[in-house]
């Protein structure tokens, strides 16, 4: 249960950082999209233990 709470907090933190960087540094948007797509692929194929 504790690991799920930590994972949720990290996800919220990543969302906040993504929004911050996409607003302040528009050049970071492709990198952010790439990072999110890799994360979604990991979740889809359950690579995260």
From Swiss-Prot:
It comes from the Viruses. It comes from Enterobacteria phage T4 (Bacteriophage T4). This is Uncharacterized 5.6 kDa protein in Gp42-imm intergenic region.
